[in-house]
Regions:
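Helix-loop element at the rim of GNAT/NAT acetyltransferase active sites that forms part
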Residues: 20-35, 43-47, 167, 175-189, ...
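Conserved donor-binding loop and adjoining core beta-sheet/short helix segment
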Residues: 12-15, 23-109, 118-119, 219-233
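A short beta-loop-alpha structural element at the N-terminal edge
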Residues: 5-18, 160-175
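Phosphate-binding active sites in nucleotide-utilizing proteins
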Residues: 182-224
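Conserved acetyl-CoA-binding loop-helix of GNAT-fold acetyltransferases
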Residues: 91-104, 239-242, 248-265, 284-288
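C-terminal "cap" of GNAT-fold acetyltransferases
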Residues: 142-164, 169, 269, 274-280, ...
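Conserved hydrophobic beta-strand within the GNAT/NAT acetyltransferase core sheet
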Residues: 81-83, 114-117, 237, 271-275
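Acyl-donor-binding surface of acyltransferase catalytic domains
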Residues: 72-78, 86-158, 300-302
């Protein structure tokens, strides 16, 4: 580890520095996807994020050069570590030091597993994880749509599409998301407080969260967001799910198409999403809708001995 470097707990005065590191490690630079300090503050202020206890920064000469944030998912006994190190400070052992902090935090939380997501092309990060006892367990595709023709949703009789309503639909969305993703790898059930905070983030709009209903009963949903600059806008399909009782009716395609229509109507230049590479039905649906695979990330895990009592 570099002489003079310290790894310490995050402080709220670190928001701008952490934002700069986040943008650097994700190659966001001056793109429309870059976080600003206000959005990072919103993100870190969400319920259960707790950055003062579960975020650590690496600092040298009063400069924050890296960070790690540990997300604690108590319902499924999991923690997720995310973060990284500024480009000029890599290959100096700082990333390994931050990873060790994440491992220690996960152990103190008594979780069963710690997960870390890295680029499939991040050979250095993969080597560090493997030497620290992590094993690759899952791949995710990042996909992009650049089409001009928007697919149109086709609904069975009696079904309709409506937008989310702030102050009314938080519990509905929470319940639908939890039941739709209950059996999916890595999904931790959400609380109403968590969903209420997320729908109010700057890059979300109520109109961009869509429900398909069956005579008023929520059957499927699509949750979109938009990152925009003065010159470019990218739309994201962040979550999409169908209630188990309504699967096999074509609602998955219909709700994704509805989300795509909404995003294109807002003037986005492209639409992006990610999907579990082993989720064949979802992956094939996106391919049929015109999405192309543009990147892949890998999930690594470190398991901990099961604790009794």
């Amino acid at each position: 580890m570099e002489p003079g470097l310290q790894v310490r707990n995050f402080r709220w005065t670190d928001v701008e520095s952490v934002t700069a590191v986040f943008n650097d490690i994700n190659n966001l630079g001056d793109t429309e996807k870059a976080f600003d300090a206000d959005f990072m503050l919103q993100f870190l202020s969400q319920p259960d994020v707790d950055p003062l206890e579960r975020c650590f920064v690496a600092e040298t000469d009063d400069l924050v050069v890296g960070f790690v944030l540990i997300s604690y998912e108590a319902p499924i006994g999991r923690a997720v570590a995310s973060g990284g190190v500024l480009g000029d400070y890599r290959k100096q052992g700082i990333g390994r030091e931050l990873l060790n902090k994440a491992v220690s935090q996960a152990e103190s939380l008594k979780v069963e597993v710690l997960h870390v997501e890295v680029s499939s092309q991040g050979d250095a990060a993969k080597r560090v994880l493997e030497t620290e006892g992590f094993h690759m367990t899952k791949g995710y595709w990042q996909m992009q749509w650049l089409g001009d023709v928007r697919p149109s949703p086709s609904l069975p009789d009696g079904y309709s599409i409506r937008p989310f309503e702030i102050g009314k639909d938080e519990e509905t969305l929470t319940q639908l998301q939890n039941v739709a993703f209950g059996e999916n790898w890595g999904f931790s059930p959400n609380t109403v407080d968590q969903i209420s905070a997320r729908v109010r983030l700057d890059r979300m709009t109520p109109d961009g969260i869509l429900f398909i209903t069956d005579n008023g009963q929520p059957a499927a949903y699509n949750w979109t967001m938009i990152s925009a600059s003065e010159s470019k806008a990218t739309g994201f399909i962040s979550m999409t799910g169908v209630h188990p009782d309504y699967r096999g009716k074509g609602l998955g395609r219909a709700i994704v198409a509805a989300g795509m229509q909404y995003l294109k109507a807002q003037g986005v230049d492209s639409i992006e999403l990610e999907v579990d590479s082993e989720n064949t039905p979802a992956r094939e649906l996106y391919l049929k809708l015109g999405f192309k695979k543009v990147h892949e990330t890998l999930w690594y895990e470190k398991k901990f001995p099961t604790r009794v009592g």
